[in-house]
Amino acid sequence: MLDPILLRKDLQTVVSRLKTRGVDFDTQRFNELEARRKAVQTETESLQARRNALAKQIGQLKAQGQDASAVLAESQAIPARLKQLEDDLAVVQQSLGDLLMAVPNLPHESVPAGASADDNVEVRRWLPGPPAADGNPPPLPFEPKDHVALGEPLGLDFDTAAKLSGARFSFMRGPVARLHRALAQFMLDLQTGQHGYTECYTPYIVNSSTLYGTGQLPKFKDDMFFVTKGGEDDDPKVDERGNALAREDQYLISTSEITLTSVARDSIIPAANLPLRLTAHTPCFRSEAGSGGRDTRGMIRQHQFDKVEMVQIVHPETSYQVLEDMVGHAEHVLQLLELPYRVVLLCTGDMGFGSAKTYDLEVWLPAQNTWREISSVSNCETFQARRMQARFRAAQGKPDYVHTLNGSGLAVGRALVAVLENHQQADGSIAVPKVLQPYMGGLTVLQP
């Protein structure tokens, strides 16, 4: 959530920066609510002062033996009006909160302005060998197969997945399932062993309050999987008087960024305990409501996929250096897997809702002859922290909001796709990257 004080002090700057994201902020609605808030607070303060003055006057009149009934009558009418103003203020603040909850983060000044992915800026690329003339990885010396053709003989089974669950799911058995597990274990070991993250196991189901805190709700409700408990609709919960209790909404997580970042929710962390570096390997569930039929073949865009997530909760002064560090942590995974990739700085129009600055890592897929996203690393600054009330306190001074950062380290399914395609051999076998061989029982080649 944006800083309300910044909106009050410099609304036009906020509006201009949001326009670079293609967002038109409703200034009329905001100004109306702000005017109402100020009016309510001004009247409240005036009435409180009047109440205090009347109390003093009543005491003086009684001490002098004079009639205080008129003053007392005025004083007795004030509490009811104060209660009404308190209720009015709560309504206004809720409306302001609802308005701001739907507004994305402000882009950092270093983010290039742009409308779409076409305006993103490549920062660097890394190839395990010499590039071709166009700067991309050289073509394979044979016609490359895509990950579906390579994976099916190794146990990648989309027909069974479709029978069990429908489209955009995967079923794996045998060598390809083992490779998928090896990738996840390798990523976790690297992030915990070399990059200083603490491994976590988190719930896969969260309540709506958690999702509001990290920014998935309300904007991305259609991309979430809603969870209904068995029998809940047939046997609604009631209180001791028989009144129906509101059902608590629960959702499957779309990323463990949600659960890892929410560790700091409603808490004040001693500054000496920062940074918090957390990682987890979890399944992620997305409805892909806005995918528009893209990437229907294979594992690129799934309703369920695994990811190793990196989250850091840090002091505001360090967050942009931490962002660069986290990009390096994701790059390290790709380099050890000997996968060609490039780092892209997203423009204002292509960033995620809660991000102030985002880098995407895109891996090369020979069969598609293109780069595809495999990791996204973002600094959300205080955007999530304000929504979650996640703060820190130095030894001296008042609590202040932390900065939160998140990134994929990596998406396991897409890493599997990239390994299959980049390490394929002419006979359809897969050369196992050296770093994965200990996780594969010493196997060096996967034979179809």
Swiss-Prot record:
Localization annotation: Cytoplasm
Record remark on domains: Consists of two distinct domains, a catalytic core and a N-terminal extension that is involved in tRNA binding.
Molecular functions (GO terms): ATP binding; serine-tRNA ligase activity
Identification of the protein by name: Serine--tRNA ligase
Family listed: Belongs to the class-II aminoacyl-tRNA synthetase family. Type-1 seryl-tRNA synthetase subfamily.
Keyword match Cytoplasm: yes
The protein's annotated pathway: Aminoacyl-tRNA biosynthesis; selenocysteinyl-tRNA(Sec) biosynthesis; L-seryl-tRNA(Sec) from L-serine and tRNA(Sec): step 1/1
Protein source organism: Bordetella petrii (strain ATCC BAA-461 / DSM 12804 / CCUG 43448)
Upper taxonomic lineage: Bacteria, Pseudomonadati, Pseudomonadota, Betaproteobacteria, Burkholderiales
GO CC entries: cytoplasm
HAMAP family xrefs: Ser_tRNA_synth_type1 (MF_00176)
InterPro entries for this protein: aa-tRNA-synt_IIb, aa-tRNA-synth_II, aa-tRNA-synth_II/BPL/LPL, Ser-tRNA-ligase_type_1, Ser-tRNA-synth_1_N, SerRS_1_N_sf, SerRS_core, tRNA-bd_arm
Residues at which ATP binds: R286, S287, E288, E373, I374, S375, S376
GO biological process, one term: selenocysteine biosynthetic process
